[in-house]
């Protein structure tokens, strides 16, 4: 994960001080890209311990289309707690956009704690998988979480806004565009999450996982994360672990947490830091 360390150093050396929505203040660098070949191993940051349960369960939650944090809390994941309302709802965030993009406004009716929508919307993930199978040379395999009509109703507009899949010579690649990138807390999770998504997509469509390409808009380090970043940069990245899927899964929506096994992850101790809300 030297790429990640190099990105942190670039921001510290070349970034500019900026104010931000949270009032915390950042050093920001606009426009950055990192590439992680999955043939090198599964890209988990090793210079601090990551909470793997949060990464895996959050992605399964996105793919389910759910936007209430109940599932996350039931599985020991608290990373969305600060943004949820008193009922645990977040509005039409990632899962809704991935699975029901442009569904009409919610009604007053509620089923199983979830607001009912007037229209079904576009299931972008299912459409993408269908396209991988029918037109693997397509350059139109895109899923967008950024829906301007829904942004005002979201608890937090999507930071990782759009992702694209490309199949080349039997290998599947995935590129993420992230408009806003919290380099210390958020980005290590995002790298792992979308690399996991690439592995899952490749598994259910019969391709070899290729590269995860991470394109960042505003890449920033919060002012109250400086000590933590400097500590992390004193540590040396270790060899990457491997990710094993323990059973044959035919649908991406059928994966379970127990299907994933990370082998050889030997990180340095966790480094705590406050979340800017």
Curated annotation (Swiss-Prot):
Q: Which SUPFAM superfamilies match?
A: Thymidylate synthase/dCMP hydroxymethylase
Give GO MF terms, alphabetically. Answer: thymidylate synthase activity
Which cell locations does it reside in?
Cytoplasm
List the Gene3D superfamilies hit by this protein, alphabetically.
Thymidylate synthase/dCMP hydroxymethylase domain
Its subunit composition reads: Homodimer.
NCBIfam families with a match to the protein in the record: PRK01827.1-3, thym_sym
In Swiss-Prot or TrEMBL terms, this protein is called Thymidylate synthase
């Amino acid at each position: 994960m030297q790429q990640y360390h190099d990105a942190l150093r670039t921001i510290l050396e070349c970034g500019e001080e900026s104010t931000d929505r949270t009032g915390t203040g950042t050093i920001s660098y606009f426009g950055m890209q990192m590439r992680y070949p999955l043939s090198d191993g599964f890209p988990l940051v090793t210079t601090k311990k990551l909470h793997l349960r949060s990464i895996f369960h959050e992605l399964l939650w996105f793919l389910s289309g759910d936007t209430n944090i109940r599932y996350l809390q039931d599985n020991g994941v608290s990373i969305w707690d600060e943004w949820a309302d008193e009922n645990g709802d977040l509005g039409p965030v990632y899962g809704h956009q991935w699975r029901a993009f442009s569904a009409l406004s919610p009604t007053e009716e509620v089923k199983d704690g979830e607001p009912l929508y007037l229209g079904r919307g576009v299931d972008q993930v299912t459409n993408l998988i269908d396209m991988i199978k029918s037109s693997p040379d397509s350059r139109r395999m895109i899923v967008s979480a950024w829906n301007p009509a829904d942004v005002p109703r979201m608890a937090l507009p999507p930071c990782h806004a759009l992702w694209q899949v490309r199949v080349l010579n039997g290998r599947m690649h995935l590129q993420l565009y992230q408009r806003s990138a919290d380099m210390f807390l958020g980005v290590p999770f995002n790298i792992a999450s979308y690399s996991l998504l690439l592995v899952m997509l490749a598994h259910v469509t019969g391709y070899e996982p290729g590269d995860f390409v991470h394109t960042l808009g505003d890449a920033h380090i919060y002012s109250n994360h400086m000590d933590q970043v400097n500590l992390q940069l004193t540590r040396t990245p270790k060899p990457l672990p491997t990710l094993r899927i323990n059973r044959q899964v035919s649908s991406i929506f059928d994966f379970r947490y127990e299907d994933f096994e990370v082998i050889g992850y030997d990180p340095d101790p966790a480094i705590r830091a406050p979340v800017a809300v």
